[in-house]
């Protein structure tokens, strides 16, 4: 069926994630199973909804059969009343999109209508969502690190392809050990809640030092990270990893695991050890221990920085933009976003 036929035949229902019946949860998992992405999972949606009000899921059905799920959120009751939505998890989320059965396609305007939305601003929509009929205007690169043969084999390949980078990393690692003691790495920190509190504090201090917008300033966002840290689901599991040199904390990372992939989300390192490249050493340790954890990929999310390219084995693309239906609310949303972007550019 083409987009128009599907749009006219589809029925929709807007529900809170916790109200989605087991049959719906199972269908969601089945749709996501061919390529599990933690940020598109039902478990992620439920965890966010436990801390953030006004999270909704649009359940799309065809002849009474679920064919797609579209999670999103409202920033406030005012935005909900005006039909102005945003991607689930806001600006901190690494992925956004429609979870649907194979072959399902829908135009963005129809998806908004069925979801009761006038407009929706989004980032991190993967380009493969074009197969669903969805797209955006702005394009941004992202990077994968794939190591199907395990971490040591990956590092040997890195030695051959970028000898200077590999040798420099190993030199800094040896210098760190000489200065502070042997390295100890925990893929799953034994005190996840306490370690996450420290990571959040250190990450917020990093944002202040660098002048970057603090996405952890919101108490709801911090609570969401803790909820995700407690989440243990095949398509979304919280993972907090730490590395020490002797008794000195070197670096930590909190991310989400989906099947054999780890979403590299919130890394932070000890600023007093910056000359040792602690972030690089942490990532190397995670890769070296990945095979024992059943991991074969690290997803670095959107962004094309040198630090991401250093480890990258392949590139993919995201897009962002503003979906709209005609109306006053959508026009006001567009103007508001333009003002917000202008204010941020002046900071």
Question: Model regions: which residues?
Answer:
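Residue-level marker of positions within ordered structural domains that often coincide
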Residues: 1, 33, 103, 148, ...
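Secondary-structure boundary/capping signal
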Residues: 36-40, 119, 236, 315-316, ...
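Short beta-strand-to-loop capping motifs
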Residues: 99-102, 145-147, 189
């Amino acid at each position: 069926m083409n987009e128009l036929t599907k749009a006219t035949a589809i029925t929709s229902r807007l529900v809170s994630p916790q109200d989605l019946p087991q049959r719906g949860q199972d269908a969601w998992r089945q749709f996501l199973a061919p390529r599990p992405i933690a940020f598109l999972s039902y478990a992620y949606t439920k965890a966010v909804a436990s801390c953030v009000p006004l999270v909704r899921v649009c359940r799309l059905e065809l002849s009474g059969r679920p064919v797609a799920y579209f999670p999103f959120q409202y920033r406030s009751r005012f935005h909900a009343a005006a039909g102005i939505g945003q991607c689930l998890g806001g600006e901190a989320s690494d992925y956004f999109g429609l979870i649907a059965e194979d072959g399902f396609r829908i135009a963005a305007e129809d998806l908004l209508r069925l979801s009761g939305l006038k407009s929706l601003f989004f980032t991190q929509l993967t380009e493969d969502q074009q197969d669903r009929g969805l797209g955006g205007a702005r394009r941004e690169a992202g990077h994968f690190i794939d190591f199907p043969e395990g971490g040591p084999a990956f590092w040997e390949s890195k030695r051959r392809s970028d000898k200077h980078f590999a040798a420099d990393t190993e030199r800094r690692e040896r210098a760190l050990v000489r200065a502070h003691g042997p390295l100890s790495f925990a893929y799953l920190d034994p005190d996840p809640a306490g370690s996450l509190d420290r990571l959040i504090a250190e990450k917020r201090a990093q944002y202040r030092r660098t002048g970057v917008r603090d996405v952890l300033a919101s108490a709801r966002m911090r609570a969401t990270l803790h909820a995700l840290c407690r989440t243990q689901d095949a398509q979304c599991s919280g993972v907090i990893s730490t590395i020490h040199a002797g008794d000195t904390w070197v670096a930590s990372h909190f991310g989400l695991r989906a099947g054999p992939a780890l979403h590299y989300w919130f890394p932070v390192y000890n600023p007093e050890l910056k000359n040792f490249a602690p972030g690089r050493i942490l990532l190397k340790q995670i890769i070296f221990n990945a095979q024992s954890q059943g991991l074969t990929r690290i997803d670095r999310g959107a962004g094309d920085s040198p630090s991401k390219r250093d480890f990258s084995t392949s590139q993919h693309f995201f897009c962002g933009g503003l979906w709209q239906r005609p109306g006053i609310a959508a026009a006001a949303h567009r103007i508001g976003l333009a003002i917000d972007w202008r204010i941020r550019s002046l900071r």
